[in-house]
Amino acid sequence: MTQLNIAPTPADTAAANNNANAAAGAKQVARWRVADIVALYELPFNDLMFKAQQTHREHFDANTVQLSTLLSIKTGGCEEDCAYCPQSVHHDTGLQADKLMPVDEVLAAAKVAKENGATRFCMGAAWRNPKDRHLEPIKDMIRGVKAMGLETCVTLGMLETHQAQGLREAGLDYYNHNLDTSPEFYGQIISTRTYQDRLDTLERVRDAGINVCCGGIVGLGESRRERAGLIAQLANMEPYPESVPINNLVQVEGTPLTGTEAIDPFEFVRTIAIARITMPRAMVRLSAGREQMDEALQALCFLAGANSIFYGDQLLTTSNPQAEADRKLLERLGIRAEAAQQMPLDQSGCEHSCDKHAAPN
């Protein structure tokens, strides 16, 4: 999958910065190269933030965020060996594996999420890939959540073509399937699923007409260039994802990444800003790891272009700031919670090749 977008070509550090300056304001030119994104990382912090905020305001109300709730509908027992994940059977984290939640319990949780202000309800199941029989109750969940007027998203692992089509027919708005990291660093994080496996699932989702939710995790021990490689992969998709969750590693005792040096907070903010610049129309979602951030750091992330947060008491198997604290922070910042600002793939004037795939609005 390829994406025509902005792409300066730096020759040295000074030229790289000049090209990065031009890139942020340019329209469609060419693919993003890893070196171009490294050049953005190397900009002075204030310059990068200014460019990200300019880009953000061109496409969104800078003082609104979407509130999303994520529910783990099937926890633990996953066959994959992702080094960061406590749900893997390969890691001794003390996590108790559970079966798929009943439909009525999921819908009850969605009702509470809506009452608390969420407009997007995400359902995650710890599978390598679901069996067809698993999808029937999930389709009922999707229909029930949509009937409440909530945007729907699921993350279930790898999908076959007919499975993606079935989820689309049930009315699914978004399918989440993260790349996690760059192709170069990927082998140090997971061995049970290839990078191409992930790209293939994303292509099936796109071909089915479902909006793509795809991002990654930073703080895994990757280098800046490898972080840039992740952003390049995302930004060069055709089209780039409508939804881009940026996760900050939450270290869980018993996983191989326990003890990994944490990413510098400003580097995390830079990553948010660069996601906004390179994917200007995407919803950039401040995801896992937010509980590790103080309020000032979260505010910088909003300034950098994050316009969605996962909201509530639990984010899959890691804790998340409580809903009341979130409400107070947003109020102090003058940020309003609003409904989804979804990017339709067939919108006129779309910056990337929109005519290839249709998606629900």
From Swiss-Prot:
A biological process (GO) annotation for this entry?
biotin biosynthetic process
Looking at the UniProt entry, the stretches that span the membrane are none
Q: Which residues form the Radical SAM core domain?
A: 63-290
Q: One MF term from GO for this chain? A: 4 iron, 4 sulfur cluster binding
Q: Which SUPFAM superfamilies match?
A: Radical SAM enzymes (SSF102114)
**Which family does the record claim for this protein?**
Belongs to the radical SAM superfamily. Biotin synthase family.
The UniProt function text for this chain reads: Catalyzes the conversion of dethiobiotin (DTB) to biotin by the insertion of a sulfur atom into dethiobiotin via a radical-based mechanism.
Query: Protein name, please?
Result: Biotin synthase
Q: Which organism is it from?
A: Paraburkholderia phytofirmans (strain DSM 17436 / LMG 22146 / PsJN) (Burkholderia phytofirmans)
